[in-house]
């Protein structure tokens, strides 16, 4: 920046004629106004751009803060010192986070920083997310302070220094009024903030702020008003007031006045002298965001004391440039040596200040400058050079004093946000590639395995159906044949008429036993076929599941006696007399007719002629006829009936071995067929076999479904993880893009002489 408007003094003007107050000519004033307007336009542009950038970055931080609160949040910490392992693949990521500038972890145990870093690396995901939220909260608070600072058009100048260094004298000289007490002993014990009286309707007065209250000019309850003359008394009343707000009119034109400059509102803050009690408070006050410029007053006779050294070292962490005024320089005889020693100390304490020492370090005497009779003294001109440099540093270089720290912080913060986004994008892309490849491998494999297992299950299901059908058909056929053959059953020996009833019981029991044996044979057949099918199913189970534990099949435990009990009820009947008699002679007569025809055919070849037979009949028949002729039919009826009864009874007794089994068999057949015993027994045995076969079949199906469910769950988890990664990738990608745009806008803020060190 040009020096013409920045360092105007009496010694630098050409001639005495045409000079105005303090050596300013009309040309100099117009040049000052033009250059001031240009700087004000540039300042407003940069200021507005930084305000917009702060708002954008706050939105980005709030979105990050909301994101880590989500249940599907995927955040990779940037504070790890070792490589992170992927929770999706189990492999270590081939990336490491970049160094952070602003969002850093401040470890208090400096001696064991390595151990602390390892401890931070071992924290879980939730802890790192909480750390990010804490840093976001801190950054938002700082951004809010920076926003207030940039938005505020006023500038605050803190004037501090060692005890009795001349701070109050400097303030009086800068406002060209004797308002603060001056003494060789420490005077100011309360912070005094000096403003232009225009901010108080042009009235010179003091607003004393009691302890515990926050000052507001529009709220009269937050302060007490005193006349300006009472200020020299109020500065000693530390027990009553926390701060004194002073409104004063220095009566100078805008191009000369520091407070009434026509560009921005400036406040001079006169701080108590540094000592053991006040140094810490003043250092903290100097580091606050609302302090734009720190003016440090040094007693030329004492140089930098220990308290001054500590203060400058602390304040330099926030303010890279400090305006230093070496007062009482008129008391020094070897001025060059004094300058050299003080500049060497400044070089060590504040390198930024030393680099601009021509503009920021001034050797003056406030006592000499306040006496107009000392115009010819070089120290008189030096004071006005210092005043112009201070005006230039505050007004023309407000970008350096007010905007540069904001731009520097914003640049570092967007760099950290970009580091977070870029690091997370790299790791998320790594996981997305792994999950996509995993799904590419899993889906076809799952479909193929499922198709093969479905075929295996259907094959075994068909085997079960075929086995059950075969068992049912075999049982039905065997029982039907057995029932049909009951009539020809002759395994029981007949012991005579007197044992006919026992014979009937034995025949009935034998038929029951015979049918039960057929049932047992059918059960044995069902066991055999069922065992074969079970072993076949278990073989498929073992082929598909090597680690499956198969139960031992016990075929002898199949079936219960229920169907045999059903059979027994068909044999629980009483034997009657008719069960021993077969009155149906049709079949019997048919047999006799065939036998008689055969006999006559044989006898016909040997029978005598009819003549011979007739002679025989005539000789024998006549006596018989003669007998019946002499005896009536009434006398013959009883003998004939008796003979017939004897014949019938004899026939019945003779026919019991044949008739009884037939009658019992018919009764059993009728009972069995009425209840459809064969069908029910075949269904029962088939059902029991199906129950047994369904056990390994259901086990096979269950194992298949469990495997399918597990594979589907694996695929579903991978798909869900992929969706989470893709959402996170989209989120960080959008944040990264918007952050880069914000960074471009921040970099467009060009501040003269201010470089970004991040």
Curated annotation (Swiss-Prot):
Catalytically driven reaction(s): GTP + H2O = GDP + phosphate + H(+)
Covalent S-S links between cysteines: none
Mitochondrial intermembrane topological domain residue ranges: 617-635
Disordered: annotated segments: 1-25
Membrane protein topology class: Multi-pass membrane protein
Documented EC number(s): 3.6.5.-
Residues passing through the membrane, by range: 596-616, 636-656
Pfam family, one: Dynamin_N
Region of interest: G2 motif: 187-191
Renumbered residue ranges of the record's region G5 motif: 364-367
Region (G3 motif): 270-273
Cellular localization per UniProt: Mitochondrion outer membrane
G4 motif: region residues: 327-330
GO terms classed as biological process: mitochondrial fusion; mitochondrion localization
Free-text function comment from the UniProt entry: Probable transmembrane GTPase, which mediates mitochondrial fusion. Fusion of mitochondria occurs in many cell types and constitutes an important step in mitochondrial morphology, which is balanced between fusion and fission.
Family matches, as PANTHER family: SARCALUMENIN, TRANSMEMBRANE GTPASE FZO1
Record's protein name: Transmembrane GTPase fzo1
Gene: fzo1
């Amino acid at each position: 920046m040009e020096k013409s408007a920045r360092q105007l003094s009496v010694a630098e003007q050409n001639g005495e004629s045409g000079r105005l107050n303090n050596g300013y000519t009309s040309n100099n004033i117009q040049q000052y106004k033009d250059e001031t307007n240009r700087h004000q336009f540039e300042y407003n542009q940069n200021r507005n751009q930084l305000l917009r950038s702060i708002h954008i970055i706050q939105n980005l931080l709030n979105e990050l803060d909301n994101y880590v609160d989500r249940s599907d949040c995927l955040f990779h910490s940037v504070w790890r010192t070792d490589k992170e392992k992927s929770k999706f693949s189990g492999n270590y990521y081939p990336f490491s986070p970049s160094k952070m500038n602003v969002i850093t972890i401040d470890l208090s145990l400096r001696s064991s920083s390595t151990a602390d870093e390892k401890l931070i690396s071992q924290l879980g995901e939730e802890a790192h997310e909480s750390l990010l939220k804490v840093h976001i909260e801190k950054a938002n608070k700082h951004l809010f302070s920076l926003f207030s600072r940039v938005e505020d058009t006023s500038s605050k100048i803190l004037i501090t220094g060692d005890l009795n260094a001349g701070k109050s004298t400097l303030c009086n000289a800068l406002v060209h009024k004797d308002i603060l007490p001056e003494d060789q002993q420490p005077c100011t014990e309360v912070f005094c903030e000096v403003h232009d009286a225009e901010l108080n309707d042009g009235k010179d007065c003091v607003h004393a702020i009691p302890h515990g209250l926050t000052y507001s000019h529009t709220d009269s309850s937050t302060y007490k008003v005193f006349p300006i003359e009472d200020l020299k008394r109020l500065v000693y009343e530390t027990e009553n007031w926390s701060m004194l707000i002073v409104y004063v009119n220095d009566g100078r034109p805008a191009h000369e006045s520091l407070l009434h400059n026509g560009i921005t509102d400036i406040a001079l803050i006169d701080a108590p002298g540094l000592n053991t009690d006040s140094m810490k408070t003043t250092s903290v006050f100097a580091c606050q965001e609302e302090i734009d410029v720190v003016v440090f007053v040094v007693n030329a006779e004492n140089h930098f004391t220990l308290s001054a050294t500590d203060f400058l070292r602390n304040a330099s962490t926030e303010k890279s440039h400090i305006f230093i005024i070496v007062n009482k320089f008129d008391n020094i005889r070897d001025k060059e040596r004094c300058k050299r020693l003080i500049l060497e100390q400044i070089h060590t304490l504040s390198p930024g200040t030393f680099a601009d020492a021509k503009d920021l370090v001034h050797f003056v005497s406030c006592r000499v400058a306040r006496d107009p009779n000392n115009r010819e003294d070089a120290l008189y001109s030096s004071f006005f050079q210092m005043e112009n440099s201070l005006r230039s540093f505050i007004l023309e270089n407000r970008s350096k004093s007010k905007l540069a720290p904001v731009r520097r912080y914003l640049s570092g913060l967007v760099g950290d946000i970009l580091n977070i986004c870029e690091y997370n994008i790299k790791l998320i892309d790594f996981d997305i590639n792994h999950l996509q490849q995993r799904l590419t491998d899993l889906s076809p494999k799952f479909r193929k395995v499922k198709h093969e297992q479905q075929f295996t299950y259907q094959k075994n299901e068909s085997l079960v159906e075929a086995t059950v059908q075969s068992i049912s058909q075999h049982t039905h056929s065997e029982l039907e044949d057995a029932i049909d053959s009951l009539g020809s059953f002759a395994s029981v020996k007949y012991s005579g008429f007197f044992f006919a009833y026992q014979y009937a019981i034995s025949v009935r029991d034998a038929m029951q036993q015979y049918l039960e044996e057929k049932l047992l044979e059918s059960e044995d057949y069902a066991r055999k076929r069922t065992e074969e099918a079970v072993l076949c199913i278990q073989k498929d189970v073992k082929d598909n599941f090597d680690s499956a534990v198969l139960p031992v099949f016990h075929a002898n435990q199949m079936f219960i006696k229920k169907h045999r009990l059903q059979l027994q009820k068909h044999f629980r009947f009483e034997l009657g007399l008719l069960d021993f008699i077969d009155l149906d002679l049709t079949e019997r007569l048919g047999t006799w007719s065939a036998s008689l025809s055969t006999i006559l055919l044989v006898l016909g070849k040997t029978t005598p002629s009819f003549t011979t037979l007739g002679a025989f009949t005539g000789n024998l028949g006549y006596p018989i006829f003669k007998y019946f002729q002499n005896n009536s039919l009434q006398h013959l009826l009883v003998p004939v009936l008796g003979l017939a009864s004897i014949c019938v009874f004899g026939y019945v007794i003779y026919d019991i071995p044949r008739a009884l089994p037939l009658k019992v068999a018919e009764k059993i057949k009728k009972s069995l067929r009425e209840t459809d015993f064969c069908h029910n027994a075949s269904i029962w045995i088939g059902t029991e076999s199906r129950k047994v076969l369904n056990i390994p079949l259901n086990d096979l199906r269950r194992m298949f479904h469990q495997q399918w469910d597990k594979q589907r769950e694996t695929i579903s988890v991978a798909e869900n993880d992929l969706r989470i990664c893709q959402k996170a990738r989209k989120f960080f990608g959008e944040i990264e893009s918007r952050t880069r745009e914000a960074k471009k806008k921040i970099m467009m803020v060009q501040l003269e002489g201010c470089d970004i060190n991040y």
